[in-house]
Amino acid sequence: MVNAVAVLKGDSSVSGIVRFEQESEDQQTKISWEITGNDANALRGFHIHTFGDNTNGCTSAGPHFNPFNKNHGAPEDEERHVGDLGNIPTDAQGISKGSLTDKHIKLLGPLSIVGRTVVVHAGQDDLGKGGDAESLKTGNAGARHACGVIGISNA
């Protein structure tokens, strides 16, 4: 069992914690989060970005983690970046709390996301269905409101 965590901060009021858990390299990874400071009753893009570099804020995290050179897509799509996690919903207070499992996100092995950055975006991810080049690259999810480098944790 491997556990990892990212503490999200940014230039906005958005902040939170994202936790990752994987039993073994061939198992799905559970991702859970509690994130505050978003707009109320919204959907916000949620992605793993390539670099664990936040020296220039969330911008230096680079593009979505995409080791297979695919187009952007929804988490359930075969054509997607490894780092495409779709949208997280917020409640009436702008809080998002939830979990999902994903077969492409790995904490173990050569495609590990440990040391990369998780990002919450300012807008809704169109899941690559927006009909333009940017949709196929970023999902038109907008600015990077908060981010954190993913590191190994003890629980």
From Swiss-Prot:
Enzyme Commission code: 1.15.1.1
Alphabetical list of InterPro entries matching this protein: SOD-like_Cu/Zn_dom_sf, SOD_Cu/Zn_/chaperone, SOD_Cu/Zn_BS, SOD_Cu_Zn_dom
Free-text remark on how the cofactor is bound: Binds 1 copper ion per subunit. Binds 1 zinc ion per subunit.
Disulfide pairings: 58-147
Binding residue positions for Zn(2+): 64, 72, 81, 84
Cell location: Cytoplasm
GO molecular function: copper ion binding; superoxide dismutase activity
Transmembrane segments: none
Summary of subunit composition and partner proteins: Homodimer.
Biological role stated in the UniProt entry: Destroys radicals which are normally produced within the cells and which are toxic to biological systems.
UniProt-listed PANTHER family: SUPEROXIDE DISMUTASE CU-ZN -RELATED
Protein name: Superoxide dismutase [Cu-Zn]
Lineage: Eukaryota, Fungi, Dikarya, Ascomycota, Saccharomycotina
